[in-house]
């Protein structure tokens, strides 16, 4: 079934994600703060461009956001030109951003009060996963809403799972980022050790990647790390932002980490 879809936020993740929804045959209207990105998108994919989040959301069956942080999400959602001003009753709002569980629960309640539904649905897989349409999506919200939205989420993902009630998607993403950060740090230390010990890193990685040390980061990042090339994948500043969310959530929940 063809649906009217709004997609707000055309960064390195959102741009191809919106593209996959368009290629699946849905009617997509995009908004991005930097207008040139939206103009580029409509030149590449079938769809329309809006001047505000509210304009993009007007008449949409499904509204997607993929923005940088809590403040950005509040602005495009609840701001003067935010999507809450025009979102129709019965629509589903799916947020793919990595933000706090607190703001997700706030938007869930605000959406209910307005007569529509909200899912927190952060993503994992990086730019390559977005461009390949093979992202992993961890979802928090109501089961009925999830079942309604899943066919559209499937357009850009290979694995979608409802974890639990509102906020559960973001809490799961926090765990995901903790695991990745620890793995990257360990891999970095190991590579530094191996290089300074005079080892052939190709032989080392070919060997240990077949054992218990194997990880996605080892398979996909060891060579660029060995070559001191770091303009790949997920930016350090974004990881720091995500880990700050983890620390704040742990404090609020009295969890020792």
Predicted regions and their residues:
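Hydrophobic beta-strand scaffold residues
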Residues: 28, 49, 117-119, 160, ...
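Rossmann-fold dinucleotide-binding core
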Residues: 67, 99-177
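NAD(P)+-binding Rossmann beta1-loop-alpha1 motif at the extreme N-terminus of oxidoreductases
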Residues: 1-65, 91, 96-97, 127
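Rossmann-fold NAD(P) dinucleotide-binding segment
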Residues: 53-116
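Conserved small/polar residues in nucleotide/adenosyl-binding loops
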Residues: 255-257
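Active-site-lining helix/loop region of Rossmann-like oxidoreductase modules
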Residues: 161-165, 169-219, 223-253
